[in-house]
């Protein structure tokens, strides 16, 4: 009789526990690998502040690497084509095309690194359970910051492919300040190569974004007070018609912050003090004729701390 009662209680407890599809490490490992092994077609909606953007996505993998095409379905016309780490962005209305190289982190949204040890110093990561997005079963991960210098995240990852189907960015109060969500998603055996064709660009102006990666880049600037965990991951020199600007990117492995340094007279960023819209916060200051602007999807304290600590090294 005791055995029967124990078995019944065990079944009752287990039946009310969430049926997790893999542990956190397995899910994160699949998330990191999904970009290099998945073929799919889908549509997602990106909500930032009071604006919404809808994008059609085609993602493919072949013997030449990873291909991705994203095309806006509302607002300004835009098409982005990526082959491995090269990204071509086309803006038909402005007759503009930009070409850039991406770093290790690919895609629109922060991807959790496979090695969670370093990230665990700044975030608590746990699995919340399962949910359905775009008609597909997903596993939900919660990423909670341990200090006030970064936001929190929630990830909905497709159980079959581990592709990110939904992502919430959460502020200090736990409120959603930005959201990406697929409304349709179809896993494919192969996708048509024609989806990645570049249209005729006659009459378009072309802008090349040259990037030097790594802390050894001779950039002439540094931040003397950086929130714990943020490291220089990328430096970019952008050349305009009458101005040259330096773009530095710092990251803790998940959140990223951009620093723009340019001549004050020809600056495209003329911000003084704090500013913010939705998840994006910015802080600007002038220093000896140089405009320094720091921005990122992080709390205001983070961009202000970095901006006020920037100094020349040469």
Predicted regions and their residues:
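N-terminal leader/targeting segments and the immediate start of mature chains
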Residues: 2-66, 120, 130-132, 267-314
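An acidic-aromatic
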Residues: 56-110, 166-183, 187
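Short N-terminal edge-element motif at the start of the domain
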Residues: 97-99, 104-149
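Short, solvent-exposed recognition patches
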Residues: 203-287, 301
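Short, small/polar residue-rich loop motifs at catalytic or cofactor-binding pockets
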Residues: 74-76, 124, 149-151, 278-279
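Gly/Pro-enriched, hydrophobic low-complexity segments
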Residues: 130, 134-202
């Amino acid at each position: 009789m005791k055995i029967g009662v124990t078995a019944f209680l065990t079944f009752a407890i287990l039946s009310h526990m969430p049926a997790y599809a893999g542990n956190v490490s397995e899910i994160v490992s699949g998330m990191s690998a999904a970009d290099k092994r998945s073929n799919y077609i889908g549509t997602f909606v990106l909500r930032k502040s009071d604006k919404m953007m809808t994008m059609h996505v085609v993602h493919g993998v072949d013997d030449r690497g990873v291909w991705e095409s994203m095309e806006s379905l509302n607002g300004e016309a835009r098409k982005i084509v990526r082959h491995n780490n090269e990204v071509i962005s086309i803006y038909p209305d402005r007759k503009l095309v930009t070409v850039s190289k991406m770093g290790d982190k690919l895609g629109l949204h922060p991807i959790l690194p496979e090695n969670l040890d370093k990230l665990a110093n700044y975030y608590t990561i746990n699995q919340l359970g399962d949910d359905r997005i775009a008609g597909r079963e997903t596993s939900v991960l919660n990423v909670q910051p341990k200090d006030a210098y970064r936001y929190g995240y929630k990830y909905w990852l497709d159980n079959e492919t581990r592709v990110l189907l939904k992502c919430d960015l959460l502020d200090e109060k736990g409120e959603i300040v930005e959201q990406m969500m697929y409304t349709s998603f179809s896993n494919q055996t192969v996708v048509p190569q024609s989806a990645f064709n570049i249209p005729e660009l006659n009459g378009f102006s072309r802008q090349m974004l040259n990037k030097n990666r790594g802390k050894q880049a001779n950039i002439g600037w540094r931040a003397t007070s950086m929130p714990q965990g943020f490291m220089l991951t990328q430096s970019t020199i952008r050349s305009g018609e009458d101005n040259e600007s330096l773009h530095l990117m710092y990251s803790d492995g998940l959140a990223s912050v951009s620093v723009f340094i340019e001549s004050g007279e020809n600056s495209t960023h003329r911000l003084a003090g704090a500013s913010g819209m939705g998840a994006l916060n910015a802080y600007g200051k002038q220093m000896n004729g140089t405009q320094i602007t720091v921005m990122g999807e992080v709390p205001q304290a983070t961009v202000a701390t970095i901006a006020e600590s920037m100094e020349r090294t040469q």
